[in-house]
């Protein structure tokens, strides 16, 4: 069973880059602040350009550094996409449950993500701002159906009251770890037999100070 805990004293076994995408004002920066620092600011301003935060945690006795990247959703910042997506092994695709338009744009964001990132990147669809449930404009079932159709994980969250924020990030990070661990095992087995592993192709992941190539596999799930 996986264990999650902050640990800054051990060596880093893996560094996983995860990107936050979605329209502006859906709460991407607030989700990042809640997960990385357990903070929430009512006065949050729109993100300009790109920033990232890190959090170190433990999964199955391995020390993982999650590098979470955040960029503004406005069209004028789209120029950063190539560098932004490069090397990402996970993505949090965020919409605001009170703004139907932000959900309607999810398909476009997903297309852009899949056009720039590894085709097997692990993706979590997030319906944020459940604390504003009385203003809901996107039925949960609509998002579940989209996630199932596109082979995505799905959760609804609230950065304000922290509901499901931790589980959503940990689900993605655990899935990435599971895939990487499985591929490393296959690589070791084929290495011993003199074979080549076709699995070890795709997104670069830093492993214990060295770069090894791996790719994630999306998985369907709902919450």
Swiss-Prot record:
CDD domains to which the protein is assigned, alphabetical: Rab11_like
Location relative to the cell: Cell membrane
GO molecular function, one term: GTPase activity
GO annotation terms (biological process): protein transport
GO cellular component: plasma membrane; plastid
The entry's keywords: Cell membrane, GTP-binding, Lipoprotein, Membrane, Nucleotide-binding, Prenylation, Protein transport, Transport
Gene3D superfamilies with a match to the protein in the record: P-loop containing nucleotide triphosphate hydrolases
InterPro entries membership: P-loop_NTPase, Rab_GTPases_membrane_traffic, Small_GTP-bd, Small_GTPase
Function: Intracellular vesicle trafficking and protein transport.
The protein, known as: Ras-related protein RABA4c
Originating organism: Arabidopsis thaliana (Mouse-ear cress)
């Amino acid at each position: 069973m996986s264990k999650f805990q902050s640990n800054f004293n051990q060596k880093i076994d893996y560094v996983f880059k995860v990107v936050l995408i979605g329209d502006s004002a859906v709460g991407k920066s607030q989700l990042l602040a809640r997960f990385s620092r357990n903070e929430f600011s009512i006065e949050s301003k729109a993100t300009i350009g790109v920033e990232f935060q890190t959090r170190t945690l433990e999964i199955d006795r391995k020390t993982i550094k999650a590098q979470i990247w955040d960029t503004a959703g406005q069209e004028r910042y789209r120029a950063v996409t190539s560098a932004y997506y490069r090397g990402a092994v996970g993505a949090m695709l965020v919409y605001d449950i009170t703004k139907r338009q932000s959900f309607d744009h999810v398909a476009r964001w997903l297309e852009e993500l899949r056009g720039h990132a590894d085709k097997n990147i692990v993706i979590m669809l997030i319906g944020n701002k459940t604390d504003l449930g009385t203003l809901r404009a996107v039925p949960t079932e609509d998002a579940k159906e989209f996630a199932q159709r596109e082979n995505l994980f799905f959760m609804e969250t609230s950065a304000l009251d922290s509901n499901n924020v931790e589980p959503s990030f940990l689900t993605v990070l655990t899935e990435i770890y599971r895939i990487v661990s499985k591929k490393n095992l296959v690589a070791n087995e084929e290495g011993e037999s003199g074979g080549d592993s076709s699995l070890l192709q795709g997104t670069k992941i830093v492993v214990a100070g060295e770069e090894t190539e791996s790719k994630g596999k999306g998985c369907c799930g709902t919450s």
